Regions:
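Conserved AdoMet/S-adenosylmethionine-binding subsite of the radical SAM
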Residues: 76-247, 254-255
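Generic preference for flexible, low-structure residues
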Residues: 34, 40, 47-50, 110-112, ...
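N-terminal [4Fe-4S]-dependent radical SAM core
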Residues: 1-93, 101, 302
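Auxiliary Fe-S-binding modules of radical SAM enzymes
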Residues: 1-19, 43-46, 50, 170, ...
Length: 318
């Protein structure tokens, strides 16, 4: 069957995050500087959340371990947020669970089915799901309903030289699991790109990918992205007909080039980028349009809401 796209060309989408589940735990090197940890810690001190829920659900999501703040491996399901996309009539690109992982073992199949039911019904929206837990993604794929408006992605942070063999195999397996996945549109996040991308990585059937260097509030803690890793990744994508985008060059690059001083702490401003990378810069997810994907994806018109290249990217990280 021909793959189907759900977008109408005339739609103008906005972007939102739908954090119906929050909380996580580390699975690979790409998690080491995860922005969700300080964000959950920040939210735990928000009095408005405490006032609304009686207690602050974020309080239990992080803990101090070996003198550092880390995930506690506990999760929280915000049932009151479940219907949010159904109440939003304007077509929106929703990044699902930016402070968690949809396929974390703490997210029950029952909760997953309820989340998918909302996404299935809200077919005037796009839902981007990004995971590092491709094994559970694969295990549950036939137990969930994959309407064309649900895009599935995996994170591939590259293969650092010091990555243990067991972790290396798991990271590589994410791509093979995604290739076989039934989602209508499939994508890869090469962010944070902290190691080389194997030249024999098979991206058959992957529709698009975005690349990004690691961002961090502290210059010395941000791991650098080698420009050659990025160039090799772009060339690999193009060889498979996978549309590549570049989100940012990372904090280490911004510091090395002096852009840190100009508040571009993640290397998102593409004006000072190497010239060959500028054409791949993405301003936002809204730029990933049917026109971009048309060579790969056929596109009938689907749901409407019920009545009642150089710059800064707002794509999800890692």
């Amino acid at each position: 069957m021909t793959k189907k796209m759900f977008l109408k060309n005339e739609k103008v989408y906005r972007e939102q995050t739908w954090n119906v589940v929050v909380g996580c735990s580390r699975v690979s090197a790409g998690c080491d500087n995860c922005y969700a940890i300080p964000e959950c810690q920040r939210m735990s001190g928000n009095p408005k959340i405490t006032q609304k829920h009686g207690v602050n659900p974020y309080d239990k999501l992080v803990q101090i371990r070996n003198g550092k703040t880390d995930f506690s491996s506990k999760l929280h399901f915000f049932e009151d947020r479940l219907s949010t996309p159904l109440r939003v009539k304007r077509p929106t690109i929703w990044f699902v669970n930016s402070l968690s992982d949809m396929y974390h073992h703490g997210v029950s199949l029952d909760v997953l089915k309820r989340i998918f039911e909302v996404m299935n019904r809200a077919d005037w929206h796009i839902f981007d799901i990004l995971t590092k837990r491709a094994d559970r993604m694969e295990e549950l794929s036939d137990k969930l309903t994959w309407t064309p408006n649900i895009w599935q992605g995996v994170t591939f942070e590259g293969i650092p030289a010091d990555m243990p063999d067991g972790q290396r195999k798991k990271v590589l397996s994410r791509i093979s699991a995604l290739r076989e996945h039934p989602a209508n549109v499939k994508f890869v996040s090469f962010e944070p790109l902290i190691g080389a991308i194997p030249p024999d990585l098979d991206l058959t059937g992957i529709d698009w990918a975005f690349f990004g260097g690691e961002s961090h509030r502290t210059i010395l803690q941000a791991r650098p992205m080698e420009p050659q890793w990025l160039r090799d990744g772009i060339a690999l994508c193009e060889s498979f007909g996978c549309k590549p985008y570049v989100k940012q060059l990372g904090t280490a690059w911004a510091a090395a080039t002096g852009n840190w001083r100009f508040k571009d702490k993640a290397g998102k401003d593409s004006l000072p980028w190497p010239e060959d990378l500028c054409p791949y810069a993405i301003h936002s997810l809204r730029e990933i349009t049917p026109d971009d994907l048309r060579p790969m994806v056929a596109q009938p018109s689907l749901g409407d809401p019920p009545s009642s290249n150089c710059g800064h990217a707002d794509t999800p990280e890692g």
